[in-house]
A protein has these predicted regions:
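Short, flexible/disordered secondary-structure transition segments
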Residues: 12-13, 40-45, 74, 78, ...
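Charged catalytic carboxylate motif
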Residues: 25, 88, 109
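Conserved C-lobe terminal segment of protein kinase catalytic domains
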Residues: 70, 94-103
Length: 143
């Protein structure tokens, strides 16, 4: 849940408020998708975004402690930051789950960034799925 929802400070009469919380949620889903991508190293057993910080079915108070008090967000492994394409995804995630809803990217901005990533990938002559990051963090390209 987005911080403003946990704090009960969301403006329910403003459609933009809903869009901002959706962007936060989208970032959590993108984090989950990235964590399951074999292009960023070995795919480990599934773990929810806050899995290492909260129990399996956390209560609202536990999420408030993690998201509001501790400003916790899902962990971004260093191997993701060593992958050129995934690094851009990580930067996008961080900007989408900003504590301040007004500071978050819009959904349109996320679309534009991903389009840019796709365009960059075409220019480089390879697809993101060809680039693998082994556990040691070095980058290799599949032939």
């Amino acid at each position: 849940m987005a911080p403003e929802v946990l704090e009960s400070r969301m403006n329910l009469e403003n459609v933009e408020s809903f869009k901002q919380t959706d962007v936060y949620s989208m970032a959590l889903v993108l984090w989950e998708m990235t964590s399951r991508c074999n292009g960023v190293g070995e795919v480990k057993e599934y773990e929810p975004p806050f899995g290492s910080k909260v129990r399996e079915h956390p209560c609202v108070e536990s999420m408030k402690d993690n998201v509001l008090r501790d400003r916790g967000r899902p962990e971004i492994p260093s191997s993701w930051l060593n992958h050129q394409g995934i690094q851009m995804v990580c930067e996008t995630l961080i900007e989408c789950w900003d504590h301040d809803p007004e500071a978050r990217l819009t959904a349109q901005c996320v679309v534009e960034r991903f389009s840019e990533l796709k365009h960059h990938d075409k220019l480089s002559g390879r697809s993101c799925s060809e680039e693998k990051i082994p556990e040691d963090g070095s980058v290799t390209t599949a032939k």
